[in-house]
Design a protein with these regions (language model features):
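The feature captures the beta-strand-to-loop junction immediately N-terminal to the Walker
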Residues: 36-38
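Helix-to-loop junction immediately C-terminal to a conserved catalytic motif
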Residues: 51
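Conserved coupling/switch loops of ABC nucleotide-binding domains, chiefly the family-specific signature
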Residues: 57-60, 110, 210, 361
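Conserved ABC transporter NBD signature motif
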Residues: 59-67
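Non-catalytic connector elements of ABC transporters
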Residues: 249-374
């Protein structure tokens, strides 16, 4: 299989429109890497430069130690799956999957062997004689993936392959891609704007914004220790609550004081603040909705709030609450933790008291947005 290395890669359109800037990344053999970010961040452009579909303005792309900047896409030994299936409507599934092999004049026996093997892995053997119009969206996407698989390429590139599918089918195909990766054991580079896809599929995630890499890490690393506010708010759903408050040091202990409450920082976060000798200062505090809990009114750590919106998600409630100064927060509560009477109370206008779990809070510089502990 193959390693992929990008060194100081830059892409400029026209004279001064910078799409990708200073992109440096080493991708290990058989790694599943995901580029994720909002529209226009440069993720698809980067993938297309790896594929050879976009020229590189500066820097180098290497596949298996060979610089491929000047190689045509067909000479890079890569396979690519696009957002659009791009199947030939007049050809059967078998013929679509075999098309590139026949162009290369691969022997017919080998064509049959490769296509049927890929079809079996993807669960589309029974559709090999059908034409694309007789297939569902998910089945067509499997055919597109199979067409790439039969090429037996070193690197598998996937550009938002699930974005045309409905939510249910997207979830199903996401699971199938995870299983596919385990079966074919090759290097994957996958592009998506969906952080759920990124978190569930990737060995590592590359989070991009405005052409720059913001953070590279495992799903756990980027979720637990986002390097800045952009990553913190982009990764995780519902998104992280962020607001200005003060971090207060009292001896070897740290507290945050949002909305008049006093909440102690505990666990590893407290140890890290102490090790860095962080002093009292104004910060932007980040708290994920699942780390907001209900509190007793008399507790010094309690923050009074009023429910404005209750989103019933089935296994959990997403409460949009407003504290007394007008700031809005999201609270995520598993429904299994609530009694029937408590559920009935969670309606517009209901007052409740919340607090934050002290061991999982995040602290950002209010001017730069950088995580104080990253």
């Amino acid at each position: 299989m193959a390693t992929v290395k990008l060194t100081n890669v830059k892409k400029i359109y026209g004279k001064d429109t910078v799409a990708v800037q200073d992109f440096n990344l080493d991708i290990a053999d058989k790694e599943f890497i995901v580029f994720v970010g909002p529209s226009g961040c440069g993720k698809s452009t980067t993938l297309r430069m790896i594929a050879g579909l976009e020229d590189i303005s500066s820097g180098t792309v290497e596949i298996d130690g060979v610089v491929v900047n000047d190689l045509q896409p067909r000479d890079r030994n890569i396979a690519m799956v696009f957002q659009n299936y791009a199947l030939y409507p007049h050809l059967t599934v078998f013929e679509n999957m075999a098309f590139s092999l026949r162009l290369k004049k691969v022997p017919q026996d080998e064509v049959y062997e490769r296509v049927t093997a890929a079809a079996e892995i993807l669960g589309i053997t029974e559709f090999l004689t059908r034409k694309p119009r007789a297939l569902s969206g998910g089945q067509r996407q499997r055919v597109a993936i199979g067409r790439a698989m039969v090429r037996d390429s070193k690197v598998f590139l996937m550009d938002e392959p699930l974005s045309n599918l409905d939510a249910k089918l997207r979830n199903q195909m996401r699971a199938e891609i995870i299983l596919l990766r385990q079966k074919i054991d090759t290097t994957f580079i996958y592009v998506t704007h969906d952080q759920t896809e990124a978190m569930t599929l990737g060995d590592r995630i590359v989070i991009m914004k405005d052409g720059f890499i913001q953070q590279v890490g495992t799903p756990t690393e980027v979720f637990d220790m986002p390097v800045n506010m952009f990553v913190a708010e982009f990764i995780g759903a519902p998104k992280m609550n962020t607001f200005k408050t003060n971090l207060v040091r009292e001896g070897d202990k740290y507290f945050v004081t949002p909305y008049g409450a006093k909440i102690e920082v505990t666990g590893k976060k407290a140890e890290m603040l102490l090790a860095k000798n962080v002093q009292s200062q104004e910060i932007i505090l980040g708290v994920r909705p699942e780390h907001v809990t209900q509190a007793d009114a008399q507790d010094a750590a309690a923050i009074p709030c009023t429910i404005k919106v209750n989103e019933m998600m089935g296994s959990e409630l997403h409460l949009h609450v407003v504290e007394e100064n007008g700031d809005q927060l999201i609270v995520r509560i598993p429904t299994i933790t609530l009694e029937d009477e408590q559920r009935k109370e969670m309606v517009y206008g209901h007052k409740l008291y919340i607090t934050f779990e002290g061991k999982v809070m995040h602290f950002f510089n209010p001017e730069t947005g950088v995580n104080l502990l990253a």
